[in-house]
Amino acid sequence: MKTKLKILYIGLLLSLVNFQALAQIPMFSNPIIKGGYPDPSICRVGEDYYIVNSSFEYFPGLPIHHSKDLANWTLIGHGLHRKEQCTGRMNLVDVQSNGGIHAPTIRYHNGKFYIITTNVYQPKKDEPAQMINFIITASNPEGPWSDPTIVEGAPGIDPHIFFDDDGKIYYIGNHAPENPNFQGEGEIWMQELDSTSFQLVGERHFLWRGACQGTWAEGPHIYKKDGYYYLLIAEGGTSFNHAVMIAASNNITGPYDANDRNPILSTRHLSYDYWINSTGHADMVELPNGEWRMVCLGIRNEKNRASNMGRETLILPVKWEKEPYWWKEIKYNWPVCNPTTGKIEKNYSYFLPIKDSIYVPTQREYEFQENYIPKNWTHRRVPLENSYDLTTNSGYLTMYCKEPTIKERTGYNFIGIKQKETNFEVSTTMRFDPTLDGEEAGLCLIQKDDNYLLFDVKREDKENVLQLVINDKKKNPIIKKDLVMGKKFKNYIELKVIAKGNTYQYYFRYQSNDLWELFETTNSDILLSEGYTGAHLGLYATSNGTKSINFAAFDVFKLEYSYPPLKLKK
């Protein structure tokens, strides 16, 4: 009996030691880039890793993140950072919602970075969309980036650029084939690019229509490994049936043999209630030690199998394994995603030594003391001239009451940052002296031109009104609540929105030493992402069509994902 107890004691002791050892292993969490950063493409230069994402109608566009450990990522710049890059055929001035920059690829070759991508622009609602495929280059990923070179005669979206060992450069894209076998069938095509002009030359080759008769074969990437070319694509559409497929060939022009075990990554076989869904649109990178990793997009299952953040960037390990089938003449090596489970996990131990800070701030406070806007602040479309500045009122972000409104397809005066967690607290302090009916400014939480929350001050019938306006896509904008402030409003107000659980709570106070007053409570599902982008939290000013030279001055913008309880006015 004593022997058994001794063995049991030793077993428990070893288990405790193992548990403590595991507890000390540094871990990181997916998504690695939180907020609406979909369609990731990754490249490595030495020990540095870079990811670029789709940006759609937002400006600056093509956000670029950097990391040394594949877990901690820092936004270092944008590929589209000048108005001159985004006019004419590259129109991001009045681009439609869910249009704009789709699915880029980033690559490094001979001392230069390349980004190739598509601007989807629909001139009018009833007209066909134009697919403008283009290339930009830079010697430094932080910029500046070149003006776009449009690749003429390139149909489809989601282009890829591939540099082969023989010096040739190839464009790989997708299109809708003639005589499709089923509705939504896509096809991957390839053509050589002139290395100087970046224009298509030579014969066009049609490579693959996908593995499982899934719709919308897109997002191609080609890799060369051990003498074989591997074609990785997305299939099934960017929702619950999204998936990653792969094929291989010993010739870049094909024919390509599909992996019998496709899809190699998906959540289509998992419960709709798994923590992440819609995974797909992947890219891979080889580490210096020969290991591989894959990045892809996914949607967190936060509420109703969706989230405000939309499609975010995830990472997972990949292991190459040779086919064991003795009867096959050619036995390919294929990438196996997360080999032990085949699905994306929420937490991983670090793939590489930790070289960046692992501190993740739960609070960001912007006081606008500098003479520049932080890199993570973006506009919906290229902003109008003289929409804002940091010099008119020192220490304030001054936003002018321009005529366009939030419902219009133009660069109305909004600036904000991506929402990164479901629960948050956002607040601002605003100095605003509206004098003309229609002048309006305050907090704006937005998904699209037709899906937003405005918690702001508006001049109506010669009165200053605090209002909550909601557009939840199901109906026209409604004023959920309004309050004539009268003499209590002395051109200064603090606004706060707290998102927690199933509710949004809206607070205000007239002076910084006042207690907060609860203005209204709503459901939290108003901004669930149904399009290509995630929610943004920011600031807004308009004159609602009236000519105005007035402005609102914002002193502080504060965003917290972990916050203390409020002291409320009874």
Task: Describe the predicted segments one by one.
Residues 1-25:
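Bacterial Sec-dependent N-terminal signal peptides
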Residues 23-570:
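Carbohydrate-active catalytic/glycan-binding domains of CAZyme proteins
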